[in-house]
C-alpha cells in the first residue's frame, strides 16, 4: 500500500545523499533536512525544495567559519568550524559560539531563488578524521560510497602505514572494486581492503 507520507523532515544528524535516496525510495516521499542547536533554541537552518544546503536567517544569525587549529577565518567556500553569533535583541544571546560542527558557507545562489545564505554541514569535529594531508573526512563522505554499495553498517580503520580497511557485516554483499578505489581516493590511502 502506498504511504500517505509526502515528505520527511529530519534533524539531529548529518544526512548523506545516499541515505536521503534510500529514505526517499523506502517512503516514496521527499526528504528534507533541518539543522538546529539547543543553544540557539531550535532550528537555525532548513533545506528548501532544492535540497542543496541549509538556508539560515542572516538577520538573526551571523555565522563565521574558522580553522579548527587556529581559530582564524578560512577562505570563502572552505570547510571549517561554525562559530555562531545570535543577532536578536532579547533572550539569551550567543557571542561567537564555537559549535564543533564542520561546515562551509555555500557561495553560489540557490536555484530556489531565495536570498537567504546557505551552509553545508559535514558533521561534528569529534566524528571526523583529519588526514595526514590536512583534509578533514566526515562519516557523511564515507557513507556516500558505502550505502551506494549496499553496506549499511561499517567501520573504516585507518593505519599509520597509509592503508585502510573497510570492516563490514553485510551478509551476501561483496563490494565492487570501485568502492575500494573510491575510498582509496577519499582517504588518500595507498591501499583499501575489506573484511
Predicted features and spans:
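Active-site glycine/GP-rich loop and adjacent strand/helix microenvironment
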Residues: 1-195
Amino acid at each position: 500500500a502506498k504511504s500517505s507520507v509526502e515528505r520527511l523532515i529530519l534533524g539531529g544528524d548529518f544526512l548523506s545523499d545516499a541515505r536521503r535516496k534510500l529514505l526517499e525510495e523506502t517512503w516514496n516521499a521527499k526528504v528534507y533536512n533541518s539543522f538546529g542547536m539547543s543553544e540557539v533554541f531550535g532550528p537555525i537552518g532548513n533545506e528548501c525544495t532544492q535540497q542543496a544546503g541549509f538556508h539560515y536567517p542572516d538577520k538573526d544569525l551571523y555565522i563565521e567559519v574558522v580553522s579548527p587549529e587556529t581559530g582564524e577565518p578560512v577562505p570563502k567556500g572552505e570547510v571549517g568550524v561554525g562559530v555562531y553569533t545570535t543577532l536578536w535583541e532579547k533572550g539569551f544571546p550567543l557571542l561567537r559560539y564555537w559549535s564543533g560542527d564542520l561546515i562551509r558557507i555555500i557561495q553560489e545562489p540557490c536555484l530556489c531563488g531565495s536570498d537567504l545564505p546557505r551552509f553545508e554541514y559535514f558533521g561534528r569535529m569529534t566524528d571526523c578524521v583529519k588526514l595526514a594531508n590536512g583534509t578533514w573526512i566526515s562519516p557523511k563522505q564515507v557513507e556516500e560510497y558505502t550505502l551506494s554499495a549496499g553496506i549499511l553498517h561499517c567501520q573504516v580503520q585507518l593505519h599509520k602505514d597509509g592503508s585502510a580497511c573497510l570492516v563490514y557485516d553485510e551478509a551476501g554483499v561483496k563490494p565492487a572494486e570501485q568502492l575500494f578505489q573510491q575510498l582509496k581516493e577519499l582517504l588518500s590511502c595507498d591501499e583499501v581492503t575489506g573484511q
